[in-house]
Amino acid sequence: MKKSAGPFIASWRPFVGLPVSLERGRTFSRVLGICTYTPAIRRQMLLSGVSVIPPPLSKNFFRHAHLTGFSPFRSSCRRLFAQNGSDVAPLVSRIPNQSVAPGDTQWSVSPMGVHCEHWLKTRCLPGLPAAVFGSHQQVEAALLQRGLSPAKDASERVRSATREDLVRRERPTSEAGSHPPLPSRSSVSAFQLRSRCDPAVSGPSDSAPCGLSQTSFSLRSSSSSGATTRFSVPAVCPVFLCRSLPRLSGRFSRTRFGKQRKRTEEQEDSKDFDTGPLSSGSIFTVLVGSLLFFDVLRSGLYEHRKLLGAFLMTNAAVFTGWRLAATAGNGTWWTFLMRHFVLCRENLARARIYTFVTSSLSHKSTGHLIFNLFVINQLFRLLSFDLSDRDFASLFGLAALCGGLGHLLVSRQPVLGASAFAYALLWTEATRHSREMFRILPIPFFPLTALQLVQVAMCLEAAMAFLARPAFLARFPASRLLRFAQGISWSGHLGGLAAGCLYSWYKRRVEGDRSWQSFSELCRTYGTSDW
């Protein structure tokens, strides 16, 4: 099977429900399974006599999640036609010219799609009366009114599509009285079509239940004499198809993917050691915070670098605010923190430009706070004799700006944390003291230079950018590595490295300080020997 070039990978056997006809159901299921959206393939794909014309590629995940071809958001949706010798009866949705309203959606489906849509109507909304879907008596009356004689096979097709026959064939094991409740008017109002009911079929006194407007289908059937018969059937199938589409696209639909991701996040939150006032995460936070506080009080470094001590204490204070708001369930305090200590497009739209800086002082999780403060503290100790308070503030502001812009360019999710500043300090250390040796805690016997750490960080962020694609998480929703990559702002980290690069370039080229070396020259000099 070919993989999709779009934002998801198609499933071989998507969930489409119980078929009305076994043979047609298999064909329809196979078509749904093999049809993938690719920008280069705009030709017909034949499988079991079914031709498929895929639409152009779109970057919208919601459109490409539906493999059925019933997307109401495109007028050029796929057309599925069943060809079986002389028995050619495609069901093409049309709206009469006298009742077409601006913006109405045109529908094109196949007989197999019709069976599937009848299955949806009968399974999801069994409480609707059969008159809504149109009976064969109404169709024959409409044909006689137009001076046409209904063909036998066409009448049989319409008669077989009535609700009673569908219930008997589609739900052989269902018990009486087990129908789900009928949805309210407000739940389907967003999917109503603006076209009026065909007056030739349904008179002015006929009205759709729940306030639903109706559209008309035009069915062409070739009889034995070769004449083409055309008749209209009032239906509300597109309205219910809009609501039932997610279940047709299997586990890659937006609805099921969102539910599964939400369930996974709830399970992870229940296992998080940070939850609860007396949890291990909270106790660990208090201990580490106390040690950090006493270190600030007795350290001579912070007496000369009070700005660094203020930075660490501000991060600890904001983190304490997040913890208190989560523990006490104070919605007002939580809203205040979300508005003023989180960087997102909504806050920028409300002219909260200062969130570029305040979000770099904010941490919600214990691990994120401890790791960032540990790295920043260690790197600043090494750079304490090279960077002044002015350099510290300038580099912090530049890292906050570049990291925030880098994240907003590729993601709409809110972001917070001082990781960009940590990466900017790491780049500064690599250009100032490239031969400084570091030992990583999990592997202490494998020392790395500061230059190697920057190279490893760049490779890791590139790997995170590759793994953070929605296609991988849709294919492997239970993977913890992919969920971790989704929660990491790799673009913000790269923005922090870019901030360090810009600041070192300014120091070297503008101020003429030759102690700031070029990263590219260092890589050419020590790249081969280090590895």
Curated annotation (Swiss-Prot):
Its main location: membrane. Pfam families: Rhomboid. It is an enzyme of class 3 (hydrolase). SUPFAM superfamilies: Rhomboid-like. This is Rhomboid-like protease 6. Residues 153-173 have a biased composition (Basic and acidic residues). It comes from the Eukaryota. The chain crosses the membrane at residues 277-297, 307-327, 367-387, 407-427, 440-460, 484-504.
